[in-house]
């Protein structure tokens, strides 16, 4: 099998994530595809990245309504799977009273939920470039149906724990696959705003699901929490199957490329086997792995040869409906059933944990999930008793304040961040850097820790209700702004390996959330609520402050990880 990859990756000046997003006086000075064709821009002169082809089957060329419909479905799936993952708490009291299932057991179920959310991602990710995006969504929604039915039928401790494994598996698609699909249909300069809606959908599912689930449990029975989850997941599965088109697209087919004489999967495998030997050889030549990859024309001769390609894309016909909604869309590079390719990808994808941007995004986003565990636990501990005396619905309504804060935070790190990036790029000779998105988090650096102190210390010391609700809004602001920035920063840094990067973030994020789920109650009991939240606020401040070294050395980190990035792009042919 011959493999293809665009030539830009082998340019010695290439740095992952660094892009020219504004036209210069000489447009020919920039052409990501080396095609010689005019660079495509929007009306404001922003260069469209990735460059769209002329094919009617290119998702970047879809009409506005077609994109919005697809975006709506993806956002609904995101909110739904987040809601199903956060509705079990509404049934805890009933399960404890009727069947004697302990709260600790249900806490264990929450830990299992987080583990399956994070680690399911890496099992689904390799299938994305081999079999298409749709199959993962369908499997995850089916898992959501099964998990919800199992939870609705719960009678034993094992039911409440292992039903959450399937529920967690269902949310895995929203942790990485959705971001990949969004990057398939939207341009890079739009991703901040697009991710605003994604984080909002996650926020609505996470913060309003407990309220809705409590209302269902009170008006019907606790079992209907599970039944309604299964019904909505099933209905969404049907809509998705018939209404959500495949977005995977072989972009290299429409642009001049370089062709390798050997299989890329084999190429990556051999690179792994001989990595140590290669390092020694490069050291003898005076090169180091942390230097930019340099490939001279002589070195590429015989290994890479230009392919002559006359674009016939504009003459292509739109694929028939049945092909656009096919259960599986095999990659043009698929070998047989792709089992060996799947296993190679599964192993190689762990390389993303060597990328600093993955760790920064994963830690920032993961800690926000951890804080949610703490404030939900504190709500259950304090606000049913004197002097608050809230009902279950009253406690659930408290999260509306958190949602309002999340909306504001998402707007700042999404819509305003996109404008901020364009403004900074203009001041930087049209060149955009992913680190531009981090500047707005200096606002969050102050607001988010303040929110933890206002809520946690306020609950313990019985501060006025206004302080409690403002604290929750500030926590929500941190959730929304950090979530949006973490996603967009990583997607900007390594735009051709979105799903691999998001898998790394999801594993870090949900593993952290799992750990904090188990230690939360013990920490609050051992240190006291006020002291615990003060420590959390310090952790929050320090973790967000990691953006400072990223602003200084982020580009250097991306340059040093160029080889790893290229190997991952080669592995998937740039198809995610």
Question: What is each model feature region?
Answer:
Residues 52, 66-103, 124, 174, ...:
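Extracytoplasmic
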Residues 67-86, 165-166, 354-372, 473-474:
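Pair of pore-lining "gating" transmembrane helices in MFS-fold secondary transporters
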Residues 82, 86, 94, 111-114, ...:
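C-terminal transmembrane bundle
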Residues 103-104, 188-198, 392, 496-505:
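Loop-to-transmembrane helix entry/capping segments in MFS-fold secondary transporters
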Residues 165-201:
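Cytoplasmic helix-loop-helix junction between adjacent transmembrane helices
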Residues 190-218, 227-236, 240, 402-410, ...:
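Glycine-rich segments within core transmembrane alpha-helices of 12-TM secondary carriers
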Residues 233-256, 547-551:
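C-terminal membrane-cytosol helix-exit motif in multi-pass small-molecule transporters
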